[in-house]
Curated annotation (Swiss-Prot):
Annotated family: Belongs to the ClpA/ClpB family.
Domain of life: Bacteria
Function statement: Part of a stress-induced multi-chaperone system, it is involved in the recovery of the cell from heat-induced damage, in cooperation with DnaK, DnaJ and GrpE. Acts before DnaK, in the processing of protein aggregates. Protein binding stimulates the ATPase activity; ATP hydrolysis unfolds the denatured protein aggregates, which probably helps expose new hydrophobic binding sites on the surface of ClpB-bound aggregates, contributing to the solubilization and refolding of denatured protein aggregates by DnaK.
Coarse class of the protein's main subcellular location: cytoplasm
Protein name: Chaperone protein ClpB
Induction cue: By stress conditions, such as excess light and low temperatures.
Binding-site positions, ATP 1: G209, E210, P211, G212, V213, G214, K215, T216
Region (NBD2): 562-773
Subcellular location(s) per record: Cytoplasm
Cross-referenced InterPro entries: AAA+_ATPase, ATPase_AAA_core, Chaperonin_ClpB, Clp_ATPase_C, Clp_N_dom_sf, Clp_R_dom, ClpA/B, ClpA/B_CS1
Length: 873
């Protein structure tokens, strides 16, 4: 039978036949024979390999023997153009045709060819007898295991064979191999799932909950219970297989191919007569999956089986996606019974983390302290509001352990510093060896001695690092071995091989535990010596550090240097904001309370209204605070309330409502705080905003949160809210620093506030702070601050010095009505302009010191000071 018509063969067989035409030419042989066809079949990642695997025949060795057989055949020279099929290859195809008829298939497939090899006296029998190949009955049995009850009705039958192996993951097998993490708690949800699965019809639970609460973990917990036999009789010895919708859709090129694959999966499940339970994670993906014009989607293919109880299916999806996809399809929704999976409490999360602790310790090769687990649960609840427990707490522990593992395997900082110093000294030595003068030789001798000392330190530190790393690595290997032995013990107990279980439990496991104790004592001795380079335990501070990296919130415990810094906050703010003692003290007290952990965790860190005339330092104090907390003024979120004068502009703060332009972009305020939850928010000139804006402010000030247009809760609990206003500034201006009239002025200002803002808004503010109008005595300090800023802008390494007379001259720019802002204009006009012109004329150059004084003409004079004058001053 010459293969001339591709329509008789499946695609894979025709590909193999086509490939043999190249093979026999490459091998320089006379004709195509059965060995060439076998090699072509083994090159495919297809059915031949699956059948050999079922028979426990090593595929690599079959491939090697086939290559050897081809090499031993006689070669011919010359380049013939015709393709010749050998007599035995022709006979093989004829036998395959007979098997096709026996199987009642429409096309010759790979399994028909393999059956034909059992009767090939030249190559097939010689090859298969070497591997003690079973008789034809066993070969047929292996083929039936792979094919199931499928018939070859099209040219791509392989898509339907072993569909569940291709498109699914056996969770019960994963549990048997110890690849699933232990599931702690969730007993009610697992029991409810089992209850629904035990129904006669519509026995399909769907797990609904927020992302990260543990929906998939419930399915894994059920797989572990099935394995341990802790389920009702109706679920004993069942298989739980997770369907991979991505794999099912991927590569389905032709119309109807996806439906064929899914039908093959469903046929395998129904043919198992209830032995297989299907788990579809992200079940909303079946709605519309694979649907093209006029084709059915996966959801519609599932519906009949789900309703009749032929298919037991567990689904999992989030609340939003369930509402968006499943609820719209009422026929699909009624076939599923809902199981709500709530977020676990902090206490339950700590229990879950304790259950997972050993797995993460073995994986990362580090120890995890219990305080770190408690910190992960409590700190993630407080500071990471847009994610859910236990996922966010587990991620924290995982990342902290990974960070510590990275530090263990990387070179320690002390050793790295010594290595760099040795490299630097060696480079200096090479340079000095080229010099011949006496001074260089003396320096070389001293350098040699210094280098010898550093090299000695280097070798000691290196030896210590390697010793510590070796002990920690040994400990990890021992723990991995204990994990593997525990898995073997569980397997032996399930198989009732009690002798093996006892041998492992009381022999090998005890020996490994003893070695672990010895290694741990060895490590603790190294650590007690105080000279340790590596740390191998994840602590609470590591968790706090990861949270700080995720959110930008300084969660870590206060170290000595930061305590000192916070105590000096009052002084730091006073250096920038002159003459506003009450305001500075109130703000610094709020920050100190927050960082010491005493502020109310359910409200913003602090909220202030700064009242006062223009130019007295209201905005400057907010900038100074942002610079202190974040080292940059740019970290302040500034909202100019003059932009929110219209009623509709409220939507710009929290995002446009659905259907409006900009809905996807979110709000200016909410997005800024979501990206940076620890920030100073300045609402500048709040009296200019529309009254409706303050409705949004109420919940921010009271509960420390607001819901944006997308339905996300944005957390303001770690923000400092500062609002500035000019209301009542005329009364403050009248006050003029007279302490006797302060109470009277305060009551008049509050009356003005009540006439502009509602009481419920003012009642939520922590403190309303009045900024006094500036006095002439404070102006010289402000001028100094402004000239220091000018000096920092002189990017040409120039210095600026002003005489007392020059400072007083610039202070004349003060106007009590406009505050300190006219000073800026005076400095710009009198100082900056002249210096700029002198630089352009090259009168001042890099390294100069510019001295400014008042001349006889009552104008500022600029001089360049020589360096000797500077040294005598």
């Amino acid at each position: 039978m010459q293969p001339t018509n591709s329509e008789k063969f499946t695609e894979k067989v025709w590909e193999a036949i086509y490939r043999t035409q190249e093979m026999y030419k490459q091998a320089q042989q006379q004709q195509i024979e059965t060995e060439h066809l076998m090699k072509a079949l083994l090159e495919q990642d297809g059915l031949a390999i699956s059948i050999f695997n079922k028979l426990a025949v090593p595929v690599d060795r079959v491939r090697d023997r086939t290559d050897d057989f081809i090499r031993r055949q006689p070669k011919v020279s010359g380049s013939g153009t015709s393709v010749y099929w050998g007599r035995r290859a022709d006979a093989l195809l004829x036998r395959a045709e007979e098997y096709r008829k026996q199987f009642e298939d429409s096309f010759i497939s790979i399994e028909h060819l393999l059956l034909g090899y059992a009767q090939d006296s030249r190559f097939g029998k010689a090859l298969l007898s070497e591997f003690r190949y079973p008789d034809e009955a066993k070969l047929r049995n292996a083929i039936e295991q792979v094919r199931g009850n499928q018939k070859v009705t099209d040219q791509t039958p392989e898509n339907k064979y072993e569909s569940l192996e291709k498109y699914g993951r056996d969770l019960t097998q994963y549990a048997r191999e110890g690849k699933l993490d232990p599931v702690i708690g969730r007993d009610d949800e697992i029991r409810r799932t089992i209850q629904i699965l035990s129904r006669r019809t519509k026995n399909n639970p769907v797990l609904i909950g927020e992302p990260g609460v543990g929906k998939t973990a419930i399915a894994e917990g059920l797989a572990q219970r099935i394995l341990s036999g802790d389920v009702p009789q109706s679920l004993k010895d069942r298989k739980l297989i997770a369907l991979d919708m991505g794999a099912l859709i991927a590569g389905a090129k032709y119309r109807g191919e996806f439906e064929e694959r899914l039908k093959a999966v469903l046929k395998e499940v129904t043919d198992s007569r209830g032995n297989i339970i299907l788990f579809i994670d992200e079940i909303h993906t079946v709605v519309g999956a694979g649907a093209t014009q006029g084709a059915m989607d996966a959801g519609n293919l599932l519906k009949p089986m789900l309703a009749r109880g032929e298919l037991r299916c567990i689904g999992a999806t989030t609340l939003d996606e369930y509402r968006k996809y499943i609820e719209k399809d009422a026929a699909l929704e009624r076939r599923f019974q809902q199981v709500f999976v709530d977020q676990p409490s902090v206490e339950d999360t700590i229990s879950i983390l304790r259950g997972l602790k050993e797995r993460y310790e073995v994986h990362h090769g580090v120890k995890i302290s219990d305080s770190a687990l408690v910190a992960a649960a409590t700190l993630s609840t407080r500071y990471i509001s847009d994610r859910f427990l236990p996922s966010k707490a587990i991620d924290l522990v995982d990342e902290a352990a990974a960070k510590l593992k990275m530090e263990i395997t990387s070179k320690p900082e002390e050793l790295d510093e010594v290595d760099r110093k040795v490299l630097q000294l060696e480079m200096e030595r090479l340079s000095l060896q080229k010099e011949n003068d006496a001074g260089s030789r003396d320096r070389l001798e001293r350098l040699e001695r210094e280098l010898a000392d550093f090299k000695e330190d280097q070798s000691k530190l290196n030896a210590q690092w390697q010793a510590e790393k070796s002990v920690i690595t040994d400990l990890q290997k021992l723990k991995e071995e204990i994990d593997r032995v525990n898995l073997e013990i569980q397997q032996a107990e399930r198989d009732y091989d009690l002798n093996r279980a006892a041998e492992l439990k009381y022999g090998k496991l005890n020996e490994l535990n003893r070695k672990v104790e010895e290694t741990e004592s060895q490590l603790s001795q190294i650590q007690k010596s105080g000279a340790t380079l590596l740390r191998e335990e994840v602590l609470e501070s590591d968790i706090a550090e990861i949270i700080s990296k995720w959110t930008g919130i300084p969660v870590s415990k206060l170290v000595e240097s930061e305590m000192q810094k916070l105590l000096q906050l009052d002084d730091v703010l006073h250096q920038r904001v002159i003459g506003q003692d009450e305001a500075v003290t109130a703000v610094s007290d709020a920050i100190q309370r927050s960082r010491a952990g005493l502020s109310d965790p359910n409200r913003p860190t602090a909220s202030f209204i700064f009242l006062g005339p223009t130019g007295v330092g209201k905005t400057e104090l907010a900038k100074a605070l942002a610079a202190f907390l974040f080292d940059t003024e740019e970290a302040m979120v500034r909202i100019d309330m003059s932009e929110y004068m219209e009623k509709h502009s409220v939507s710009r703060l929290i995002g446009a409502p659905p259907g409006y332009v900009g809905y996807e972009e979110g709000g200016q305020l909410t997005e800024a705080v979501r990206r940076r939850p620890y920030s100073v928010i300045l609402f500048d000139e709040i009296e200019k905003a529309h009254p409706d804006v303050f409705n949004v402010m109420l919940q921010i000030l009271d509960d420390g949160r607001v819901t944006d247009s997308q339905g996300r809760t944005v957390d303001f609990k770690n923000t400092i809210i500062i609002m500035t206003s000019n209301i009542g500034s005329q009364y403050i201006f009248e006050y003029g620093g007279d302490d006797d009239r302060y109470e009277e002025i305060l009551s008049r200002v509050m009356e003005a506030m009540l006439s502009n803002f509602r009481p419920e808004f003012l009642n939520r503010i922590d403190e309303i702070i009045i900024f006094h109008s500036l006095q002439k005595a404070q102006l010289r300090e402000i001028v100094k601050i402004q000239t220091h800023r000018l000096e920092s802008r002189l990017a040409r390494k120039m210095s600026l010095k002003l005489s007392d007379a020059a400072l007083d001259f610039l202070a004349e720019g003060f106007d009590p009505v406009y505050g300190a802002r006219p000073l800026k204009r005076a400095i710009q006009r009198e100082l900056e302009t002249t210096i700029a012109k002198e630089i352009l004329r090259s009168n001042f150059t890099e390294g100069d010191t510019i001295f400014v004084d008042v001349g006889e003409t009552e104008r500022l004079e600029f001089k360049r000071l020589p360096s000797e004058v500077l040294t005598t001053q």
